[in-house]
Every structure is written in structure tokens, then in C-alpha cells.
Amino acid sequence: MFNLIRKSTEWGGKTLILESGKIARQANGAVMVSYAGTTVLATVVTGKTKEPVDFLPLTVQFVAKSYAVGKIPGGFLKREGKPSDRETLISRLIDRSIRPLFPSGFYDEVSIVCNLLSYDTVTPPEVTALIGATAALSISGVSFNGLVAGVRIGYLPSEDKYLLNASADDMLYSSLDLFLSGNEDSVLMVESEASELSESQMLRAVTFGHQNCQEVINLIREFSEEKGVQPIEFIPHDINPIVNYIESSYKQDFSLAYSNTVKKERVLKLEELRDKVLSDFAEKCSVDNVECDNQDVISALKSFERSLVRSQIVETSSRIDGRAFDEIRNIEIEVDVLPKAHGSALFTRGNTQALVVTALGTPQDEQIVDDLDGDRRENFLLHYNFPPYAVGESAALRAPGRREIGHGKLAWRAIRYVLPEKSDFPYTIRVVSEITESDGSSSMATVCGASLALMDTGVPIKSPVAGIAMGLIKEGDKFIILSDILGDEDYLGDMDFKVAGTAEGVTALQMDMKISGISVDVIEKALLQAKDGRMHILSKMNAVIQESRNSIKNHAPRIESIFINKDKIRNVIGSGGKNIRDICEKTGAKIEIIQDGTVMIYAVNNEAVEYAKSMIMDIVTEPEIGKVFEGTVVEIVKFGAFVNFLGGKRGLIHISEIKNEHISAVGSVISVNDKVKVLVIGIDREHVQLSMRRVDQETGEPIDGELYNVRKSSFSDDSSSSGTSSSGSSFKESYSGNRHGSHEKRRSGGSRSSRRNSSGSNYYREDLHSSDFGNNNRSFSNSRNGHEVPRKPRFF
């Protein structure tokens, strides 16, 4: 029933298997690829386009269902929704790798779906998916020029060792994360992030990756030969007569239009000429009474313009806007352009402009990423927006598409390495790039603008980052590398090569080809020329702002962390969250408690942070003999006054310790709610003995001298340590003297915290937020044998 074909090889220490003939047999081509514990089903289906187009309508979709790792999706529907960013990025990797290998003029619809069926969370799924897509194309009968393989490369600088298809654990120690695709002869696509690696280290990684593609390419070739499906020969329409006519009639007009250095004027003139050519051919066909194929005319126009611009660059050694090959456009930079933003920058390079804005948040603002590798929290977000007005188009705003997601991710990779560690800067950072004008290299303008905005914000980045886009004009064996390409040079050229980095090295590299690959020699020259351009841009940036500001803006949120003894966590929380809720209500701050004793305080200003911190420290600080504290009188009794200090702690000022003279009534000196400064002079278990007379009530300083010796016999070291008061009665007896008052009621059973499990282990989760403690959300309500018993949940 099944005509099963199977090929396998050992690659990178793992088994790679290609199978076909059993699953998805209605598709033009279907291949099941297994690499170690990761399995992908790749299918190819083709069809004719419904309307004439002048581009390849290729659609690539990478689909990762949660069942691949044995999970059920979250949410109400328990079903996968729109593609995740990771699915989108992998889809783009595959698309960019195979698109250059379709023949010129091939405009049939091609749909490729790569379904991740099983994932071991170790083997890179993008590698497996690209191999599957290429293998499926090779047996689909679609015209496709060559075979492609992909690899993921890591690098251990301490060992000077490159890693092939390394696991996620191995990549934690890698200074490079590079995905590369190539055919037998050349490199087709590169996507990477690095830790300030040199150009030579990046080039060696590319060479290493391309060499390791060859074994897989040979396997796919053997697999397709055994399948025996021959590709349908594609015969393009002969558009040379149309190209010749356009050249003879419109060459001078197009040359003049392309010489205009103002993009808006250039675009309008080119659109006018294209419309004129189309109407000219429509009229000509009507006169000759022949049928005109609009698609052929559009293709001929594109071919003519491409040849015209490229020949002008090669012959005149001058570019569209008159620059030299390695010349950078004029750069204008401003920072702090938006008064209420936490940081902002306006980066303008020629007719490309990015307004980049930063916003700081608390760790509670981190993005929770639901990923097949496991849920994680991301504290650095970078979003790239490309509105239609940036290129003078009238269109409705839409949700971010694949291009926006891809460009934002590239800028994210370029910036991430220079960010401070979370322990040093615990904020959540969001960077938004609004492209307000575009004439090429908007993603690299985003990188430059993001670096400037972060420094303006006060984020202590390691060093500034700049980015530049390089282009290529290749004619035969000759090639020209262009620095800082325009949009038209990107559209009509052979390569889009983007490099971002600091003065020390490369942090991100992306390469896309429009031809069937380039050699390593071309990549080397592009890297070196890009370095010169990057240094030039960095010098312009440094002239405006060289390093991060010393502090964040006054209107930015404040975050401070303190450490407390883990045994004190339950005291900070209080009964049913009473204490932590009280702190939040009084200060306006948010409190997060982590199991290791770290307390994070988030507030809108420094005053709120300091207030919250002082309240927490009052709770966790233990009174010490000889220390002075400020307290509030809460109760007057005949033998003294009770004072609350250090949060909820209570102590007694005996009547003899109120003033350094005889007083007949306590109420004649102090009253309830008075603020007083007290010295701890005795501690007997939980009872604290305080003194006012030994403290200067104005300065809060202990008073030296004779005052310490008054009634010395009553305050000897022996009596203090045993808890004896100056009146001769014990301190414990002083407390018991108020047996019928509110204090005794509190001692006799009002405090639940005194009866809690001393370990406090049941009192917090891994992370505790102040919002977790509501009046009706107490987790513990019963006590049994001195330990808390969790309340059973109710089910309705």
C-alpha cells in the first residue's frame, strides 16, 4: 500500500532520517524528517496564480503544536491560535533560504508547510524543518535550482571551538548563535547574534557551517534520486523584445529619474514612467490587434530597471544618489526628544528615520512566553513598527506582520548583549521603534536609535551599538560591495547584508541573497567594509551621547531590592497579608517577596520606595540594647506607657524612665499618639524595656554622662539582663499588671503569627506579590497541634 523510501545518515553525532511515501500522499511532495528526537512533516503543494504577478508567491509556514512536547495549550479554547513569534521567525528562515533558488520568472504559487510533530527540546527544529522543506521540494516536481541544508552554530571562545547543532544547554555557554543555510557552492542565508565577536571569528563560523551542510545535501540528493521524480522544466516567457523596446524608448527617462536623490520625487517619477510604459504597450497591442500579457510587461520593466541601475553603478563607479561605494549617508541624531518618555532618540540617516522610545517597568511587567521549550519570562522587549506613511503610501494600519517581527528580532539580537544583568538593573525594558521615513536599512536605524534611547534612559549598557546594511552588485566573477544601501539598491541588488555591533565586535549579523549564493570571500570583504561603516556611525553617535546617563528620569519608576532573613518573610507578610497590604496602601508601592529573602520594592518615586523600605526594615529589625528608635505612644497606664516601634513591636517605658525627675502622672508628660525617641535598655524574651530620659528627644542621640548613673542600683547590668525595672518589680510583672487591658488580650490569643509554624515554609510561594493577599484569600485558617492546616478548596 505504501511506497516507502527511507534514507539516513549520522550527522553531528545524531541520526538524521528522511522518509516519504507513507504520510500526506496528496501533496506534490511530502517528507518526514527525524533528527534525534525531533520530527517534522514537510509538505509542498503548487498551483497557478489567479492574477498576473511579478513576484514568486511563495508561502512558508512552520507550525509547532503543543502536543509535540506532550502539552495541552493554555487558554479557554485549549487550542493553538495565531502563529507565535518563534513560528514566524522559523518560517522566515526557511523562506529566505529557498527563495533565491527558484528560477527567474517562475510565478506559480508554492505553499510549504513544516509541521513539528515531535520535539525533544534539544535538537534545533529550524534545522530539521529546512532539511524537510528542501527534501520535499526535491521530490515535488517543482522547478527548483539546487539543494539546501541548514545548520545552527555555536562558539566556545575559551576553547576556540565551534559547535554543530548544539543543544539549548550547550548554547548557554556559547558566545554565538548562528543559523546558516547553503547549497553545494555558496552561502544563501545567515541569521545570528554574537557576544562582540571579531569579523574573523564570524567568518570562520560561516565557513564551518557551510562545510557541515554538504553531508546533508548529499543525503537529500540520494533521497530524491531514489524517489525518481523529475522536476517540471520551466520555460520562461521570452521578454527580451519588450525589454529592448523599453530600453530604446525610455532609457534616458529612467536614467534621469534614478539620478534624483530625493526619494519621494524619485518614486513619483518612476511610477509615472511605469504607468506610461504599461499604457504604451496596451495601446500598441490594441493597434496591432494582438493580446498583451501585462505580466510580461511588468517582468520586462523590472528586468530593464535592474540592468540599468546595475550597469550605471559598475560603469560610472557612482551610486543612485552619487555616493562612493563605501560612503555613508548624512546622519542626524537627537536624544531626549519626548519629554514624558523614559528615554527617546531620533536617528536620521539620509531618507531613513527612526523615532525610538523606551519605557521602564517592574519585573511584574515582564512578558510571559509560552514556548515549547518551557515557559519563560522576558524582561527586554523590542518592537518595530513600519507604518505606510514611512514610504508615502496611503493604507490602513495593520497588526505587525512577518517583516516587522523579523526586523524587531534582529534589532533585539543586536542590543541584547550590551544590556546589564538583571541583578544590576532589575527593570523590564521595552524599546519601540517607529519608522517615520524609510529608504533602506530601517532595521539598522532601529539598532542605532535603540542604543541611543537606552543611554538617554539611563540603562547602563556596556557600550553603544550601531548597525549598517550592505549591498552587492555581482556581474560574472566581478562584484561590488555597497555600504549603507538605499531601498532601490536593496530591491535591484543581489544581497542584503546587515551587520550590527560595538567598537569591539559584532553582536548581530543577517544576510539574505537574491541570487544563488555567494562565496566566503565576498562575505569577508563585506564584513570588513561593514566594520569601517559601523565605526563611522558610532563616532557620530558618540558625538551626541557617549555613555548612559548617571540615573533614570525623575518620572521613571523606581525599583530597589533589599535582603531579609528568610525567617522574617512571614512577619513582613503578616496575618493574611495584613502587613504587606498595609505597606502598599500607605506608600503606593508594590512589593514582591522571593523565597530567598529578596524583597523587591516598586514605586513611582524615591520617596515611596524609601517609605516602604523603612516600614519593611522596621518589621524585620530586632531591637537591640543600646539602640535608639522612634515610636508612637499607644497606651498610657499608671506605671508607664506602651510604645509601638519598629513596625508592630511593642515596648514599655516605665514611669521612672520617662523623665530624669519625679513625675506624679504619666499623662502629664506624654499622651497617646505622641512620637517619642526611645532607647532599648532591656529585653526579656518578647518584652522590651525602653527609656525616654536617656535620649535627646530633639536629636535622637543617646545622652552620655550622669543620667546613665541615676538610680544605678536599679539599672545595673545584672538587673537589666534579668529584666528588672527601676521600681524594683520585674519587667514581666509590669506587663502582667495590665492583665485586663487590650495588651493582655493580644498576648492571650489575639496573635495568630505567634502560633504559626516557625519555619514559615507554608507561608509563601516561589514569588509573592502584594496583590496576592486579599481580605478573602487567606490560605490558612485553622491551627492543629501548633501548625497551620491548609483550608481545602471549594468546588462548585
Swiss-Prot record:
PROSITE patterns: KH_TYPE_1, S1. Pfam families: KH_1 (PF00013), PNPase (PF03726), RNase_PH (PF01138), RNase_PH_C (PF03725), S1 (PF00575). It comes from the Bacteria. Residues 740-755 have a biased composition (Basic residues). Its main location: cytoplasm. Residues 714-796 are annotated as: Disordered. One of its GO terms (biological process) is RNA processing. Its EC number is 2.7.7.8. One of its GO terms (molecular function) is RNA binding. Residues 557-616 form the KH domain. GO terms for cellular component: cytosol. It catalyses: RNA(n+1) + phosphate = RNA(n) + a ribonucleoside 5'-diphosphate. Residues 714-736, 771-784 have a biased composition (Low complexity). Residues 626-693 form the S1 motif domain. The keyword Lipid metabolism does not apply. It is found in: Cytoplasm. Residues 785-796 have a biased composition (Basic and acidic residues). InterPro entries: ExoRNase_PH_dom1, ExoRNase_PH_dom2, ExoRNase_PH_dom2_sf, KH_dom, KH_dom_type_1, KH_dom_type_1_sf, NA-bd_OB-fold, PNPase. Keywords: Cytoplasm, Magnesium, Metal-binding, Nucleotidyltransferase, RNA-binding, Transferase. Belongs to the polyribonucleotide nucleotidyltransferase family. Involved in mRNA degradation. Catalyzes the phosphorolysis of single-stranded polyribonucleotides processively in the 3'- to 5'-direction. PANTHER family: POLYRIBONUCLEOTIDE NUCLEOTIDYLTRANSFERASE, POLYRIBONUCLEOTIDE NUCLEOTIDYLTRANSFERASE 1, MITOCHONDRIAL. This is Polyribonucleotide nucleotidyltransferase. It comes from Ehrlichia canis (strain Jake). The lineage of its organism: Bacteria, Pseudomonadati, Pseudomonadota, Alphaproteobacteria, Rickettsiales. The gene is pnp.
